[in-house]
């Protein structure tokens, strides 16, 4: 059984390992630059490419959410109009 305390501890451990991984990656990159294995220009290019990919992914996600919200809104309006039309049709057929 997973309680809130266990979940909280697991989340903190996960966060700690993620931070440790980022620190190790940063130290490795600094070492590679220091020993001229890789240049800062290459790192900048890779960072720019990764940044553009992340920006496109986030933009597509938020555009999808926005479009889905508008679709739900218009579907609601069309549904209300159809219900009114159906009620009107039923009433006129009864008379």
UniProtKB/Swiss-Prot annotation:
Membrane spanning stretches: 21-38, 42-64, 69-91
Subcellular location per the Swiss-Prot or TrEMBL entry: Cell membrane
Main location: membrane
Membrane topology term: Multi-pass membrane protein
Keywords: Cell membrane, Membrane, Plasmid, Transmembrane, Transmembrane helix
Top-rank taxon, per record: Bacteria
One cellular component term from this protein's GO annotations in UniProt: plasma membrane
Protein name, per record: Uncharacterized protein pXO2-41/BXB0042/GBAA_pXO2_0042
